[in-house]
A protein has these predicted regions:
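Long, hydrophobic/aromatic-enriched structural stretches that serve as scaffold segments
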Residues: 72-141
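Terminal interaction module
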Residues: 1-97, 140-204
Length: 204
């Protein structure tokens, strides 16, 4: 299993306009995500736990365990981060022992999903209109479509559904830094990662 990260910048556009939400405006989106009574994780837990039909995923927020929380925020750096648990459904398949694939141990139905934990990081500056999102990806399983649905729902809940805000992303590395490299503004780009623990639960 190969785990990577996806890095995006994103803007929030008002429906049928070219206007983007300014992070300098009130209410402060970061404060809503991090510190509001109905903050990002509480909003998911209360309003979106279960079937997200548009993404064909089920979603849940992992609960706190004694001495540890799966969700964090930093008011100075203006970011939230944590773990969201989700799984795809809609396909039937079999689960078998790797050494004896003819011996079927479980059959997964179309309404069942294998729940996996995914890391997320969202940073909202106090000025401008461009935020940063970092998401974990496992093999071909990424959660940006799900996070886009959740973040769009959260924003429209707080800012008014009549505004019809949508989230628009740009791949940060390919579309920005690669162009800067090609234009000669950088000599090189280095990407490094520490080794990952085999047990995904031990990585956070």
């Amino acid at each position: 299993m190969r785990t990577t990260i996806e890095v995006f910048t994103f803007k929030i556009r008002k429906h049928r306009t070219s206007d983007f939400l300014s992070f300098a405006d009130e209410p402060d989106l970061y404060e809503l995500l991090a510190n509001d009574e109905n903050n990002f994780t509480n909003f998911i837990d209360t309003n979106l736990t279960g079937d997200i039909e548009q993404a064909q995923r089920t979603v849940r927020i992992p609960q706190k365990v004694e001495g540890y929380s799966f969700h964090h925020h930093n008011n100075k750096a203006r970011y939230i981060c944590g773990i969201i648990e989700t799984g795809l459904y809609g396909k039937e398949y079999e689960i078998a022992n790797k050494d004896d694939p003819k011996n079927v141990e479980f059959r997964v139905g179309k309404n069942s999903a294998i729940i996996k934990p995914f890391f997320y990081y969202i940073m909202i500056p106090r000025t401008g209109d461009k935020g940063l999102m970092i998401l974990e990806r496992t093999d071909n399983d990424g959660i940006y479509p799900l996070m886009r649905i959740i973040l769009t729902s959260f924003i429209n809940y707080h800012y008014g559904v009549e505004n019809g805000y949508t989230v628009e992303k740009t791949n940060l590395i390919l579309n920005y830094y690669l162009n800067e490299l090609l234009e000669g503004k950088y000599n090189s780009i280095s990407v490094s990662a520490n080794s990952l623990k085999k047990d995904i639960a031990d990585r956070y």
